[in-house]
Amino acid sequence: MTNIIQQLEAEQAAKIEAKRTLPEFSPGDTLRVNVRVTEGNRTRVQAYEGVCIARSGGGLSESFTVRKISYGEGVERVFPIYSPLVEGVEIVRRGKVRRAKLYYLRDRRGKAARIVENTGTRARKLNESERQAAAEEKARLEAEKVAAAQALAAEKAAAEAAEAKAAEEAAKAAEATAE
């Protein structure tokens, strides 16, 4: 009875992760976050690319902050990890930093705000595993498309065969009435 909230949060997190999984990322990484945006009655997916400057919270309320420079102005956006509006996250490059919160980047401009790319073995492994997972997902989607196209072609062929059979029967009936 004591951990009912934790149990409910774990169930909700598992339910959301069944639909989509986010890659393992940390502050300093340059991310491309695909966000679902609703404008009037239209919905589209918009990419928001910037540097992850913080991850905070835990459980269902965990979130991450992404900072980018747009037309010379710094723009920060906080995304909840388990938000249904976050379609997916792609890691553009991994950064090498010594802090968990990179709020000092707010005061820096241009080259001073650069983050060194992490080329260590762990970063390489993570990048390779992400690429492999993306390739597997792409192959799975392609296989689904091919299967759907084949099913559609088979359905079309069956419909044409039934139509030809009906036309043949109609011709026989017309021939029988003509005699």
Swiss-Prot record:
Keywords: Ribonucleoprotein, Ribosomal protein. GO terms for cellular component: cytosolic large ribosomal subunit. Pfam families: Ribosomal_L19. This protein is located at the 30S-50S ribosomal subunit interface and may play a role in the structure and function of the aminoacyl-tRNA binding site. NCBIfam families: rplS_bact (TIGR01024). PANTHER family: LARGE RIBOSOMAL SUBUNIT PROTEIN BL19M, RIBOSOMAL PROTEIN L19. This is Large ribosomal subunit protein bL19. The lineage of its organism: Bacteria, Pseudomonadati, Pseudomonadota, Alphaproteobacteria, Hyphomicrobiales.
